[in-house]
Amino acid sequence: MDTTLLDEELASVLESFPVSDLWSDLDATRARAAEMRAKLTGKLPKVESVETEDHSITRSDGPNIPVRVYRPKIKSGQLPGLLWIHGGGYCFGSVEGDDYVVRQLVDAVGCVVVSVDYRLAPEYPFPAPMQDCLDALKWLANNTEMLLVDPDRLSIGGISAGGGLAAGLALMVRDKTDIRLIFQLLLCPMIDDRCVTSSSYLITDKRIWNRHSNLIGWKHYLNKEETCEKQPYESISQYAAATRATDLTGLPPAYIAVGSVDAFVDEDREYAARLQQSGVAVQLEVFDGGFHGFEFIAPKARISQDARELHYQALRNALFAC
């Protein structure tokens, strides 16, 4: 990866990132990621304006699903609702790991958020994580009165693999439910299992999400023996990889954001263009010099603050303009 392409502040932050092997011991990586996230958020100001409540909701094919509900303390009455789906390459991440991210979002936007702790690959490959997200969305839609959520202002969103799950969920909701979504917030979404775009080859730096991790993440999520480099995948569900969809009509308006130095920038641009060609309203933001997930990994950088504000403004416009 050519680090001269990075924003100067982000390049400086990247120098402090460790080079690590994510895949040799998944449990250790998950524990280390949780520790690093706690260390990072511990240095940030607390978000006192948001209250939370944990629930355990019915899963359609197994034990209950943990979800966390976030709500602004100072707002009363019905508010718009967002199902938030955390990132982590389909193999890492948790509700707890995204807790600070969601608190910031709720504080800035003023909506109710349900964050879902979906099952992870490789222990639970597709369709298990997607089914958990669908079950969580159905729970949100069926409990709007209890949650004080406006049933006519439901949305979904996520980052990285969470953005990929959100994109697939939007397709599934269109095809298989009567839930009406008014918006999808897709932050650097991981949506193309084929890994053949130019940008997917360029990011090899082991300090950030790179091509190798992308190949392994998809292999685990799709329950394959080999990566797609060794054995191209066929007949992949559009709900697993949204770029596989041939019909993008009838989907909710989308906000898609990604850094210019992200393995996903090409697939995200292409998906945004295809949505627009299908009559779906799209706001695409490409942040010059941003690596994967920069706005939350390096939260104090100027570019990160600007990016988050654009995310929040897009969500405010979608949820409160109607």
Short names for language-model regions:
Residues 124-146, 311:
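Alpha/beta-hydrolase active-site loop
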Residues 151-152, 168-322:
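Alpha/beta hydrolase fold serine-hydrolase catalytic domain that processes acyl esters and thioesters
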Residues 158, 162, 166:
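Gly/Ala-rich beta-loop-alpha elbow adjacent to hydrolase catalytic centers
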Residues 1-69, 227-232, 320-322:
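A glycine/proline-hinged amphipathic helix-loop "lid/cap" segment
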Residues 96-115:
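Short amphipathic alpha-helix adjacent to the substrate-entry channel of hydrolases
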Residues 78-87:
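Short beta-strand element of the alpha/beta-hydrolase
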Residues 67-78, 243-248:
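Short beta-strand-to-loop junctions in surface cap/lid or active-site-entrance loops
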Residues 141-156, 176:
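Gly/Ser-rich "nucleophile elbow"/oxyanion-hole loop immediately N-terminal to the catalytic nucleophile
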